[in-house]
Each structure stands twice: as structure tokens, then as C-alpha cells.
Regions:
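A ubiquitous, low-specificity "background" feature that marks scattered single residues
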Residues: 8-9, 36, 217, 291
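Flexible, low-complexity junctional segments that flank or bridge functional domains
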Residues: 19-282, 306, 312
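Amphipathic, positively biased hydrophobic alpha-helical segments used for protein targeting
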Residues: 11, 139, 302-303
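Hydrophobic alpha-helical membrane context
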Residues: 14-15, 98, 297
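Conserved acidic, small-residue-rich alpha-beta core segments centered on
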Residues: 129, 281-283, 287-334
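Bacterial Sec-dependent N-terminal signal peptides
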Residues: 1-21, 34
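Short, glycine/serine-rich, charged loops/turns that create anion-binding
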Residues: 11-12, 241-243, 288, 323
Length: 334
């Protein structure tokens, strides 16, 4: 059983298993397996990267695996896979990450940079400040380095992934931006701050608490929901995941499916609202949708298209964002 886990969506899967704790990995065997099976299973692995370069890189990673250690070897392998140019093909190195080496650093990327929006209570003075450097490296350099760990399809993907990777002290140490179990942060105004890992399960988090939240933000953690705004004659569909009870039952766990909302029932409700209320605009919001099963969305959209043909006065708007990915992108094109 292979210990190298590959997350391969949309192509035939490769047998794999997690390495618990990162010990006992036979990197030579796993990398040989990767080098032979990934090209065989992928529809066109070398569309953007030369096969000879790939094989040479595999050899170099094998040669350094013993000295580099499991985590660094996994990252080197993922950096190679990212260069292949397929964002649905990746090595899931998270299983080798130490959860006790996560910085309490929630970041939001806005137009002028990365801002701290969440941290531990003892670091709350960081809140609202823009991050400008880590150690001696400008934040742009840190972003460039972290971006080698995933395939960059577009700028939106970078803005989505970087805030997720940034809090990992292990990653910052791998790239040489942090040392001695802590990160030296520089904030706007040239303020410096030493940040150490914090227990992710511990209470006492500090975060911005706005007075009110827009509908799409307040409901961002549900699979899908809707709201009719009668004064504006707007029907708002918030589609956060291409998933639901039916998809779970078909592709994963029938037992878990019972606890999930039914997209079929949601669709019936949606068209009941459309047919029973004056609607001038439909907003179909997929800004938080990272994918799943595109088929359910396609069927809904096709039915919606037929409805709109009969009601040409209704304007439809589709909202996407940096987290829109995979099946959600397909549904956007639908």
C-alpha cells in the first residue's frame, strides 16, 4: 500500500494511503510509483511540462529524501507536481503538517495587501494591520514562494490559497522566512511583532466583529440557501457547494447523506418562489463555491434557463470570486 497520497480529481485515481505521523515512508518506492503511474493515469500530464525534466526532478528528490526528511520531501514533490500545470492534481502534504506549529494568523487579502483579521487574544494588537514582511523578506517574496506549492491558474487562486498557507510555521521555515520556532512579522508603519504558534483548539481568539454581515457572508458555511427580497424583487440563490444529500448518497456515504440538505427539495422550493412571486432579478452567487458534483447544478441551471425563456424580463447575475473552483467553474459556464 502506497504511503504517498495523491488527490486526483477528474482523472482515474491512484491507490494511496495517508502516512500517519510522517514516519516509515519509502520515498524511493513511492516516487518511482508516482513517476510511472501518474503519467499513465493522467489524460495529458506533460501538456505544460517536459517529461524529461519531470523524470530528472523525480531523481533529484529521491536522492535528497533521506537528508531532507518527510515533510520537505513532500513539499518538493508537490512543487514539482504544481509545475505540471493541473490544479486538480496535487500531493496532499497536510497529513505531514504539525497542527501545533500553526501561527494564530487569520489573513484577508484585499486590494492593498494582506491584513490580519484574526489572531489569539494575546496578539490582538495585530488586528487590522497590514502585513509587509516576514523576517527580512518582503511579503511579496513570501507570497511568491508559497505560490510554488500549488498550480496557479489565475490570480484569484493565489488570493484564495495564500491566506490558508501563510499561518504554517513549518512552511515559513521551509522557505527560510522563519527560524527558532517563531516568525518575526513586520506590519504597516514598520511595527515588528514576534508571533509564536498557538493551540488551535484553545479558546480566546480575537477577531473583527462587524455590526452586521451581508447575507452571502452570514450564510457562507451552509451548502446552499436562498432569500427573496420583496421590496427589490430580487431572488438571491447562495450556492456555496456543488453538493448535497443526493450527491453524498451517490458518491460517498448514504449514512451521512441523511444529515445533509436535499438539493432536489431546494430546487422545488426555488422554483416555487420564482413562480409565486414578482421577480425582477435573480442573483446566483458562487463566490464561496469550491466545487463538488457539477451535475446537480447543471440540471438546476438548465431548468432555470427554460424558466427565463418564458420570463425574458428577469435579469440574471452570476457572482464568482477567488474561491470559485472546479465544478463551480463549470456551473458558472453553464
Amino acid at each position: 500500500m502506497k504511503k504517498l497520497l495523491l488527490l486526483l480529481l477528474g482523472i482515474a485515481s491512484i491507490p494511496a494511503a495517508f502516512s500517519q505521523g510522517g514516519s516509515g515512508i519509502d520515498w524511493a518506492a513511492d516516487l518511482d510509483y508516482l513517476a510511472s503511474e501518474l503519467p499513465a493515469k493522467h489524460c495529458n500530464l506533460f501538456a505544460k511540462y517536459d517529461k524529461a525534466q519531470f523524470e530528472t526532478a523525480i531523481g533529484a528528490i529521491k536522492a535528497s529524501a533521506g537528508e531532507a526528511g518527510d515533510f520537505a520531501t513532500a513539499l518538493k514533490t508537490q512543487q514539482l507536481i504544481a509545475r505540471l500545470g493541473d490544479s486538480h492534481t496535487m500531493l496532499y502534504f497536510n497529513q505531514l503538517m504539525n497542527r501545533q506549529q500553526i501561527l494564530p494568523l487569520g489573513l484577508l487579502w484585499v486590494s492593498d495587501g494582506l491584513y490580519v483579521i484574526q489572531t489569539a487574544e494575546e496578539n490582538k494588537e495585530l488586528l487590522g494591520h497590514r502585513l509587509t514582511a516576514v523576517g527580512k523578506a518582503p511579503v511579496e517574496t513570501v507570497i511568491d514562494s508559497l505560490s510554488t506549492l500549488f498550480t496557479v491558474d489565475n490570480e484569484a487562486m493565489v488570493k484564495s490559497m495564500i491566506p490558508q498557507l501563510f499561518p504554517s510555521l513549518q512552511l515559513l521555515e521551509y522557505f527560510g522566512f522563519a527560524h527558532n520556532g517563531q516568525a518575526e512579522l513586520t506590519l504597516d508603519g514598520d511595527k515588528t511583532y514576534t508571533l509564536k504558534p498557538s493551540d488551535p483548539q484553545r479558546a480566546g481568539r480575537a477577531a473583527f466583529q462587524p455590526d452586521s454581515l451581508p447575507f452571502a457572508i452570514a450564510e457562507r458555511n451552509v451548502l446552499f440557501t436562498d432569500r427573496y427580497f420583496p421590496e427589490e424583487k430580487i431572488y438571491y440563490i447562495l450556492y456555496n457547494s456543488c453538493w448535497g444529500r443526493e450527491s453524498e448518497a451517490e458518491f460517498k456515504s448514504r449514512e451521512k447523506a441523511a444529515s445533509l440538505p436535499s438539493f432536489t427539495e431546494f430546487g422545488q422550493k426555488a422554483f416555487g418562489i420564482l413562480q409565486g412571486n414578482p421577480v425582477g432579478k435573480i442573483i446566483f452567487d458562487m463566490r464561496n463555491n469550491g466545487g463538488g458534483n457539477s451535475a446537480q447544478g447543471t440540471a438546476f441551471i438548465e431548468r432555470l434557463a427554460r424558466f427565463l425563456e418564458q420570463h425574458p424580463g428577469i435579469k440574471t447575475y452570476v457572482v464568482i470570486g477567488r474561491s470559485t473552483f472546479s465544478s463551480a467553474t463549470l456551473n458558472t459556464m453553464d
